[in-house]
Regions:
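A structural signal for multi-pass alpha-helical bundles of membrane permease subunits
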Residues: 2-280
Length: 280
């Protein structure tokens, strides 16, 4: 075997083959759920194997969207996710700029504490969080869920923004200041365009985290009209029986916003993650 052919074979076996297995491991369940969502519930109960549904029906989507309040759950998730992401994005930008550009006493300790907050599992603090939200009368409210999303997501995203902004030379700030820009203008007109891939990464990561959040919403929300999609899907599982076709349709609907977001920002997302890895 030629050395060049041998190298190519080794590369395929060590890189592409594991990636193919990983994609199949992730992709087959998604394709199976998509197939289930277009099948009649009776065929699933009977255990009939049909990868391609016959006949194809959208009744499951209509059922979960209208009769199981998924439309309401979807709106609630949009409200909490976009509301939280808007605040997280700009506060992370300001925090990242401050940590990158300013030298203040206790800066290193402050950053270590920020990082340590991400090492504590959320469930460890659930009892204290629940009592605090009840005392503040913010339990069972979407506003309270937004505040908790912001509090839990801000530390890590601030450190990410610090990493991205740290890769921009300080001379750019000084040149903008000489041209008459104040601090806010430097951040929004100079820094933000320069770190757009990184800022997009922060926004995408924060949105997906908020959209997929389950524990806080399940613990604090008692009014079914305020449930997000992640909690609402649980109630598609019956006590004695489950319509798996309807459940699959609900899961596919819940996947649409993150998939659309990733498809839209994937170019910036990949470059931003690479930049963060290099600049960190």
């Amino acid at each position: 075997m030629k050395p060049k052919t041998k190298k190519k074979l080794i590369r395929v076996l060590t890189l592409y083959l594991p990636m193919t297995f990983f994609l199949l491991f992730i992709g087959i369940p998604l394709l199976w759920a998509l197939s289930l969502s277009f099948r009649e519930g009776s065929s699933v109960i009977k255990g009939e194997f049909q990868f391609l549904p016959d006949p194809i029906t959208i009744a499951n989507y209509v059922y979960v969207w209208t009769r199981n309040r998924l439309n309401r759950y979807f709106v609630n998730s949009m409200i909490t996710s976009f509301g939280s992401v808007f605040v997280i994005g700009f506060l992370a930008l300001f925090n990242g700029y401050a940590m990158s550009r300013f030298a203040f006493k206790g800066k290193r300790i402050f950053m270590v504490i920020l990082l340590m907050t991400q090492m504590i599992p959320l469930i460890f603090n659930m009892s204290s969080i629940f009592l605090m939200m009840v005392k503040l009368k913010l339990a069972n409210s979407l506003f309270g869920i937004c505040l908790l999303h912001i509090a839990s997501g801000l530390p890590y995203n601030s450190l990410m923004m610090k990493s991205f902004i740290g890769g921009i030379p300080r001379e750019i700030d000084e040149a903008a200041a000489i041209d008459g820009c104040n601090r806010a203008q430097i951040i929004f007109k100079v820094i933000l365009p320069a770190v757009r891939p990184g800022f997009t990464t922060v926004i995408a990561y924060a949105f997906i985290t908020c959209w997929n959040e389950y524990l806080l919403s399940y613990t604090l929300l008692t009014d079914a009209k305020k449930f997000p999609v992640s909690v609402g899907l649980k109630y598609l599982v019956g006590e004695y029986s489950t319509d798996y076709s309807a459940l699959a349709a609900g899961c596919i609907i819940a996947l649409i916003p993150p998939i659309l977001l990733f498809a839209y920002v994937q170019k910036h997302l990949v470059s931003g993650m690479n930049a963060g890895a290099v600049k960190g």
